[in-house]
């Protein structure tokens, strides 16, 4: 997890404003925030990054990362699991000075343009500023796992990983009456680009946002429907094999990295499949398993999860989520979240992640997703 923030335009004391935005989302990265400011057309562009390292701990350069060979400045929130494979594809064309993801992004974008994002496997929000063409690009991953919001005010563009950072930068915090009315009446969250705040937009999943100093242009770079349709061309005999290949790669990606990780299980079929594939791939030395539950132990999936893990050296710790924990977490979420949560499971997971944080675990793998805890 990292925090991205930026401003394009004429803003007084830009670096100070960026620091305010960074402080508002400092939980996304506890390292000292780094900034980068330069001229942009007739105004300026400023970038700020809060970093939390999860995979390339020793080799990750500071961000914003400036690549003098390509004229690109990049910030990343998330992980590109296959960045070393992409790097090998680029080594015939470029000389690399670092071992991190950011330089792979700059070289890949210089080589393939917008087409580079389809080569990245992972979840990410990416900001790229081209110093030579003076253009800014925002990118959000295929399914919108990593957040990215933006707003305009008095001709200036603001963007950040969280809405509260936009407010800290001076964006007016005015609730959207239309969006709240639809939510209260129909429980709808609106269109993919909408938020519950007037003038604040989220970049939809699988979209890019280009800005040249005069106009904002959104472009879709990933279409799930088209990608699924490609599988229809595969033979029925090939599909099970292809599915297992994808699952092996996905589980392998989720266990990458040097940092200590936690494995969260829920007693589901997905958990059983994950454990089976994990045993085939090999267990990381730093992995610990946990399972949270509410109510009575025998009515949860804890016992089944313990049975599934019996043939592995992984111990499992049980984490009971009590009513008092949920009430405290609900109060916390009500104060912290800028938009409505989607139900009791969100509160439960938040309470569970708080327990994990107290155990100094910041990276949790699950059969269906991954989470970084701040």
Annotate each language-model stretch with its function.
Residues 1-338, 349:
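Cysteine-centered catalytic environments shared across enzyme families
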Residues 31, 361-362:
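Short acidic/polar active-site loop segments enriched in Thr and Asp
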Residues 257-258, 356-361:
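Glycine-rich phosphate-binding loop signature in dinucleotide/nucleotide-binding domains
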Residues 305, 352, 363-364:
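Aromatic/hydrophobic pocket-lining residues that form π-stacking "cages" and hydrophobic walls in ligand
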Residues 341:
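Active-site rim elements
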Residues 344-357:
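A conserved donor-nucleotide-binding helix/loop in the catalytic core
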Residues 362-366, 370-374:
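Single conserved hydrophobic/aromatic residue that forms the stacking wall/gate
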């Amino acid at each position: 997890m990292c925090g991205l923030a930026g401003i394009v335009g004429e803003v007084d004391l830009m670096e100070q404003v960026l620091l305010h935005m960074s402080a508002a989302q400092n939980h996304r990265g506890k390292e000292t925030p780094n900034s980068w400011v330069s001229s942009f057309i007739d105004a300026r562009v400023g970038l700020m990054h809060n970093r939390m390292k999860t995979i390339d701990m020793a080799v990750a350069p500071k961000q914003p990362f400036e690549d003098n060979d390509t004229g690109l400045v990049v910030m990343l929130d998330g992980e590109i699991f296959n960045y070393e494979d992409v790097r090998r594809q680029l080594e015939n064309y470029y000389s690399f000075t670092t071992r991190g993801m950011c330089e792979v992004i700059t070289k890949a974008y210089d080589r393939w343009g917008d087409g580079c994002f389809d080569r990245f496997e992972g979840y990410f929000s990416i900001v790229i500023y081209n110093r030579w063409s003076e253009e800014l690009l925002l990118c959000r991953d295929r399914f919108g796992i990593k957040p990215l919001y933006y707003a305009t005010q008095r001709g200036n563009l603001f963007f950040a990983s969280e809405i509260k950072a936009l407010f800290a930068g001076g964006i007016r915090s005015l609730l959207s009456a239309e969006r709240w009315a639809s939510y209260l009446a129909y429980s709808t969250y609106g269109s993919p680009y909408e938020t519950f705040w007037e003038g604040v937009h989220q970049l939809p999943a699988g979209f890019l946002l280009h800005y040249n100093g005069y106009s904002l242009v959104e472009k879709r770079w990933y279409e799930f429907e088209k990608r699924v349709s490609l599988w229809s061309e595969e033979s029925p005999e090939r599909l099970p094999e292809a599915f297992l290949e994808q699952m092996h790669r996905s589980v392998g990606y989720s266990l990458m990295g040097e940092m200590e990780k936690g494995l969260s299980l829920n007693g589901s079929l997905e958990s059983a499949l994950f454990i089976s594939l994990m045993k085939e791939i090999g267990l990381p030395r730093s992995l610990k398993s946990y399972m949270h539950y509410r109510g009575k132990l025998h009515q949860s999936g804890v016992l089944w999860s313990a049975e599934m893990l019996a043939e592995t050296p992984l111990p499992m710790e049980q984490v009971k989520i009590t009513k008092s924990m949920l009430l405290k977490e609900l109060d916390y979420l009500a104060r912290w979240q800028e938009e409505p949560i989607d139900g009791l499971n969100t509160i439960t997971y938040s309470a569970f992640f708080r327990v994990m944080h107290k155990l100094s675990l910041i990276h949790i793998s699950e059969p269906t997703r991954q989470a970084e805890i701040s």
